């Protein structure tokens, strides 16, 4: 091997060592960050705005976040994560939580929220201004304890097509899906089926365009006839 060839070989090895060290350093920084964010030295019962303004595209913390306490607030956890597209369904489990208001507010790149437990006392503005949101795996209303718990929940959700499951009975006023002009037939039916039969004088609002695309007049009349105690408004 010539001297020139040896020099080339040394340079290649140095680059490989440098890249390996850089990767190791990045992993150390990653671990250090999450050791701070998810410190186990204290028992955490407050998650408000935990990831607000983060620039991640995929919500994937190092350790799972499991919440099973009615006093734990998760309001604004992902507030204004403008690049966030979705989250890891295996890393978030909100079995029981206090307010989840503004949970994903202003996540303007959010495309889907997988089916995760999300049982909270308040979903006000939870998905507001999520312009690109297409699908939500689960809408759990079983823990809501305020009449305004669904106010502005889907404000400006223009792209929303499907809510995979509605869990519990809706007894809140102000559920408004007027912006969701692409909402599918199955979601209409799930929501109407979930409206409480025991409460009177409340209103749920849908998009006239979405309704026209999903139902014949006869089908719509039959559906709303199942909940005569509710006003189903079309805008």
Per-region residue spans from a language model:
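Residue-level detection of beta-strand scaffold positions
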Residues: 18, 97, 101-102, 124, ...
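Generic structural signal for hydrophobic residues
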Residues: 74, 100, 123, 150, ...
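Structural signature of tandem-repeat unit edges
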Residues: 29-72, 82-98, 108-121, 131-148, ...
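Periodic small-residue-enriched repeat registers in elongated scaffold domains
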Residues: 77-81, 102-107, 126-130, 153-157, ...
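Hydrophobic, Leu/Ile/Phe/Ala-enriched alpha-helical segments that form helix-helix packing faces
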Residues: 37, 78, 127, 154, ...
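Short, aromatic/basic amphipathic alpha-helical patches
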Residues: 214-227
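Short, low-complexity N-terminal tether/leader segments at secretion or assembly junctions of large
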Residues: 1-30
């Amino acid at each position: 091997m010539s001297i020139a060839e040896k020099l080339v070989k040394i340079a290649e090895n140095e680059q490989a060592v440098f890249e390996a060290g850089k990767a190791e350093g990045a992993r150390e920084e990653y671990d250090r960050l999450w050791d701070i964010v998810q410190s186990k030295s204290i028992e955490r019962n407050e998650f408000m705005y935990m990831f607000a303004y983060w620039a991640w595209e995929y919500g994937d913390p190092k350790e799972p976040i499991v919440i099973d306490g009615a006093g734990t607030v998760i309001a604004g956890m992902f507030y204004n994560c403008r690049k966030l597209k979705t989250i890891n369904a295996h890393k978030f489990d909100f079995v029981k939580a206090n307010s989840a208001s503004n949970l994903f507010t202003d996540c303007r790149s959010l495309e889907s929220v997988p089916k995760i437990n999300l049982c909270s006392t308040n979903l006000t503005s939870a998905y507001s201004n999520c312009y690109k949101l297409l699908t939500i795996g689960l809408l759990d209303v079983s823990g809501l304890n305020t009449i305004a718990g669904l106010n502005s929940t889907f404000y400006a959700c223009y792209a929303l097509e499907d809510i995979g499951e509605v869990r519990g009975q809706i007894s809140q006023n102000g559920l408004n899906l007027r912006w969701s002009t692409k909402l599918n037939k199955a979601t209409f039916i799930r929501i109407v089926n979930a409206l409480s039969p025991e409460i009177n004088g409340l209103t749920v609002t849908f998009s006239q365009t979405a309704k026209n695309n999903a139902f014949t007049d006869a089908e719509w009349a039959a559906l709303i006839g199942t909940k005569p105690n509710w006003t189903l408004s079309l805008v």
